[in-house]
């Protein structure tokens, strides 16, 4: 099995989008479908999606749409400022707003009421994280870990470095990790349950980057 670094995955994504011509929003829709199938086969009362405003969060918002379409209760908690959001995050955010999905921006006064019968989607940090997690982000991750809900992480458990088996101060303890297209390098030592799901990145993109790796 091939394990890739965060930088290699970034280059693979970039080549796919800018050289092959597959729009990033198409890859996000593909990711959504692959993640959602591991969620919608679970029994849960309510689903809570925790999302940053980058593309990892955009994946989470897209998954929230699938949960909504399955006629299950879903609420989205956004950590971060909308004006700093990625383009694909904003697209999915606007869709959820038009569907009247409940969205709350997290601050220090936010209260959570999550039970052991619920499911959490962790789409806060993906492969690009290289700094220690502090403040509201740390508080949210601590809350997720203290909950008894079933936790599904998107691409990487938030807080776990994707290149080295180390934690950036705190990390989500996922019951299931759905990592996208290729396993990340640190997963060679990962002890939790994870699956690797394709999102439509052509083999040509992968070979182009890995064959040119120094």
Swiss-Prot record:
Its cofactor is K(+). It is an enzyme of class 5 (isomerase). Binds 1 potassium ion per subunit. GO terms for molecular function: metal ion binding; NAD(P)HX epimerase activity; nucleotide binding. Its EC number is 5.1.99.6. It comes from the Bacteria. (6S)-NADPHX binds at residues 55-59, 126-132, 137, 155. InterPro entries: YjeF_N_dom (IPR004443), YjeF_N_dom_sf (IPR036652). Residues 9-207 form the YjeF N-terminal domain. Pfam families: YjeF_N. Belongs to the NnrE/AIBP family. HAMAP family: NADHX_epimerase. This is NAD(P)H-hydrate epimerase. It comes from Finegoldia magna (strain ATCC 29328 / DSM 20472 / WAL 2508).
